[in-house]
Swiss-Prot record:
Gene: psbP
One Pfam family hit: PsbP
Organism: Synechocystis sp. (strain ATCC 27184 / PCC 6803 / Kazusa)
Protein name: CyanoP
Signal peptide: 1-23
Family the UniProt entry places it in: Belongs to the PsbP family. CyanoP subfamily.
Membrane topology: Lipid-anchor
Amino acid sequence: MLKKSLSTAVVLVTLLLSFTLTACGGVGIASLQRYSDTKDGYEFLYPNGWIGVDVKGASPGVDVVFRDLIERDENLSVIISEIPSDKTLTDLGTATDVGYRFMKTVNDASQGDRQAELINAEARDEDGQVYYTLEYRVLVGDNVERHDLASVTTNRGKLITFDLSTAEDRWDTVKSLFDTVASSFHVY
């Protein structure tokens, strides 16, 4: 009888804790999978239900792409660019400087097809590794609005950009998830 009561109590506490964590964080860790690239030295969590996309023939520097199986225009990508090996992220400027430079590069390269607006730029330090979180609103083509959240850092002479993208009208729905996923990105 005592064992049955104890087992029931453990199950109830576990369920209550999982509901509480999901309600507080908006995303249960069980709903995320880990991706690790040991060659380039980075890893991140991505949502269950997202699948890898073949990047053969993609733009230079695109290392990996995942997209949602259902919301097909929600995706994440990792883009790697070479930089001098002695450069750190802070050598490239503040989060706002780097964010504006990315925005200008996108806007200049798109020939009017894509216009990005920097909404927010923040820096975070994890054990001496600096990351910039950059948030953009992007207007694509004929008034298609998108929302991007990027985490940027340097590692081994490379600038690594981890970017999540969704339709603007889905942003409020996925913001908590995207924040969790972007924060999970780190290099080693």
